[in-house]
Amino acid sequence: MTPDDTNQTFLRRYVDDYCKALDENYKQDTIRSLEHNLQRDPECTYSANQLVEIMQGKAKLDKFRYYEGKKYIKVVREQYDEREDRWRDTTVHAFIGIAKDILGNVYKPASWKAPATKHVRYSFCKKADLLFLTDPRCVGWAGGYLSLIHI
């Protein structure tokens, strides 16, 4: 195994942890929202039922996964489609470089197929960024932390 293979193996693990952090952030944000709804309207059965499902681990909350391409890993948000009874990709959350010269660089998406490469938002090769990106309290499922104003 070459050093490049080793780096990409570690990167895949980090990206997996990144997706888990985004999942947890989405879950916590959903719980906060539902609890707020219940405070405003204690009779709201929808919010109460949703909270019970989340606590029991039965809720079909949005989740994040990634696809590997030639040059980038694409992190996407999946949503459960009740009518079709399946998960489907809804939005691109971020792109992460896997080519040698951009390894670990995190980019905001410009479109479904391409990143906005003008500015590197974070890098999995920097320890502080790695810790930030794998902490559900730091990343946000909606991607606001990827805007330049927050960097």
Regions picked out by a protein language model, each given a short descriptive name:
Residues L103-F132:
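A short, surface-exposed interaction/processing loop segment used at functional sites
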